[in-house]
A protein has these predicted regions:
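C-terminal non-catalytic scaffold/interaction domains in large multidomain proteins
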Residues: 1-240
Length: 240
């Protein structure tokens, strides 16, 4: 989906930074070959300074990157990333962004860095209702989250709904928030933002806390299959 190498872009964006700032950003975002991000405390201990000082270095480093010639050079690159997010729905769980646009797992941290440094993108931290997510339109993000909350409240605790019907129900709540005529694939990605609705292995949606959605083991799956068919089934049929 992306027309550029995210690793090459991050390398060039970091190239104009002072050595310590560059190292801090590499460690914080896991941009080295190992791909492991480090905590503020761990980096602070290495340099013999406080975690708050590391945070200041990190924030200053990001600001410096945004003001750099390299950032201006890569403006079309970040626009390409913005177009990719917009095509996917404009409001996405971070895990969805990475699954949809990363060429491989090694690109994940580099994409998160570009989202963080790019002025086009806004971040919302994981909370009780929603996963970590990114958006390019503040109003749309609010509308989608309001619709997801209303959708959850409208559901009976243990009721399961086929995906096509569930999307129709979600579309009604979106329309009430002023969001109309969105493709099913976009609405499905928006559903994945929520931590309170989910889909079981049979493709049926409902409240995440329902035992019919949160399948824990083979016995739960067998029960769900029998319940769906509404009649006794041989074990080999359930196993399929």
């Amino acid at each position: 989906m992306l027309s550029f190498s995210v690793k090459n872009v991050t390398k060039e964006l970091l190239s104009e930074l002072p050595e310590r700032s560059r190292r801090v950003l590499i460690d914080r975002f896991g941009l080295s070959g190992k791909g492991e991000s480090r905590t503020l405390d761990a980096i602070g201990q290495e340099y013999g300074i406080t975690r708050e000082r590391i945070r200041q270095i990190e924030n200053h480093g990001l600001s410096t990157v945004r003001d750099s010639d390299a950032y201006e050079t890569h403006a079309p690159t970040l626009e390409d990333l913005k177009r990719a997010l917009n095509a996917l729905g404009g409001v996405l769980a971070e895990e969805t962004v990475l699954r949809e646009i990363a060429k491989n797992e090694g690109d994940h941290n580099h994409i998160v860095f570009l989202l963080t440094v790019g002025h086009h993108f806004d971040f919302r931290r994981e909370d009780a209702d929603f996963k970590t997510r990114w958006h390019i339109d503040e109003q749309l993000a609010e509308q989608v989250e309001q619709a997801l909350s209303a959708l959850y409240e409208s559901l009976e605790t243990n009721r399961l709904t086929p995906e096509d019907e569930f999307l129709q129900l979600f579309a009604k709540h979106l329309k009430q928030q002023g969001v109309k005529n969105r493709p099913d694939d976009v609405m499905t990605r928006w559903l994945l933002i929520s931590k309170r609705v989910g889909k079981n292995p049979l493709g049926e949606w409902g409240r995440q806390e329902s035992p019919h959605v949160r399948i824990k083991n083979t016995r739960d799956f067998a029960y769900l299959t029998l319940k769906r068919h509404g009649s006794p089934m041989h074990f080999t049929e359930v196993a399929k």
